[in-house]
Amino acid sequence: MARNKPLAKKLRLAKAAKQNRRVPVWVIVKTNRKVMTHPKRRMWRRTKLKE
């Protein structure tokens, strides 16, 4: 990817990086392990973003 990115693309990539986190431990504890995963997790090799 280019070193010089448009700001809008950079912000989109940053938002996607922030969303790509595991479910917090306190949520897992609070829901008694019913919620362990979330469907928006993305593997950088398998699923690409629309840019």
Curated annotation (Swiss-Prot):
What would you give as a GO molecular function for this chain, any one? structural constituent of ribosome
Entry keyword Signal:
no
Pfam families from the UniProt entry: Ribosomal_L39
One Gene Ontology CC term in the entry: ribosome
A single GO BP? translation
Q: Which InterPro entries match?
A: Ribosomal_eL39 (IPR000077), Ribosomal_eL39_dom_sf (IPR023626)
Q: Which residues cross the membrane?
A: none
Q: What keywords were assigned to this record? A: Ribonucleoprotein, Ribosomal protein
Task: Tell me the superkingdom of the source.
Answer: Archaea
Protein family according to the UniProt entry: Belongs to the eukaryotic ribosomal protein eL39 family.
**Could you tell me which NCBIfam families the record lists for this protein?**
PRK01242.1 (NF002316)
Per its record, how is this protein called by name? Answer: Large ribosomal subunit protein eL39
Which organism encodes this protein?
A: Thermococcus onnurineus (strain NA1)
Q: What is the lineage of its organism?
A: Archaea, Methanobacteriati, Methanobacteriota, Thermococci, Thermococcales
